[in-house]
């Protein structure tokens, strides 16, 4: 029997990595992936554009996010282009401490609301140590995840539209809409009904900055009227329900404006808050004839949605 030398093993491993990288890249190239991660009572959303750019919206309450990411990312991938903290409460930010230790992160987008907790301070300090560029979200900011594909992938910030440093975390929660071709996802964070009404009432406010993680960072874009925003940037295929299905979010008026085919609720099994609340489920049931499909992480685990730019399909 021939001896297998260390050099041979190294070459085989390198070849194997190259093959799997090529397969993975080819599989990802044509689709947008949006995965609502099963991390218990909290929020964590993994987004991967067709060109491979990756964003995580909220990090969940603990290190479980690492396990869930391991199912979606190849083991050799140690970079994440951007993390977004919709609000600084523990159930949205704690997992980012582990992310920052394990992955190279380029950008951190945050709402600007304050939290003096130890975990929030730890995440902020890690971001500083790792040289992560921090940006405060404002309405009109456009984050271009993919400008190379036939259909651009862009995240548009709908809220906040002001300094929210003195607001409660939920009242300043980031709200965004993700668009790829003809498909959209509305991401609500923990935004309460008052923020939903504020978004619905946009009339004359101007939109502001644009940010492109694939290129040179923040840069200005043309301003558009709030009415144009209302008309064109609310309807979405998927509505990520605000605040884990709490009755303090998800008004009938807002659901009607978004007109989703899927409503996704991220909450933990038998959580102490009783999320999702019955009132929210009753509201969503009013739209079942459209039809509206309700998906819950506490029932289904991690929910993976794929878009080809024309339609979303559930992969899991």
Regions found by a protein language model. Give the residues of each.
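Non-globular, low-confidence helical/coil segments that flank catalytic cores
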Residues: 2-316
